[in-house]
């Protein structure tokens, strides 16, 4: 009978044999995709962006909304933490006055 350790090692070796070629093809720099990425990296800053309506000097409405919501969540979390701390102090024997 085959031991479970031997079977596990066989399965791991088979998995590595199947995954290694796929990973090497992903990592390799051959093909059109890396060339397109390189071209996109070179042409990242383009004056035509302003013509497309992409503001680069002002925050978007989504960013402003995100920061307002983040501030609201932080205020609520701070209030909850303060309330919890206060309740713990009043419930503990050290916080009670005799």
From Swiss-Prot:
Sorted alphabetically, the keyword list is:
Disulfide bond, Host Golgi apparatus, Host membrane, Membrane, Signal, Transmembrane, Transmembrane helix, Viral envelope protein, Virion
- Span of the secretion signal? 1-24
Q: What is its main location?
A: virion
Subunit arrangement? Interacts (via N-terminus) with gM (via N-terminus). The gM-gN heterodimer forms the gCII complex.
Q: What does this protein do?
A: Envelope glycoprotein necessary for proper maturation of gM and modulation of its membrane fusion activity. Also plays a critical role in virion morphogenesis.
> What protein family does this chain belong to?
Belongs to the herpesviridae glycoprotein N family.
The name of this protein is: Envelope glycoprotein N
Q: Which organism is it from?
A: Suid herpesvirus 1 (SuHV-1)
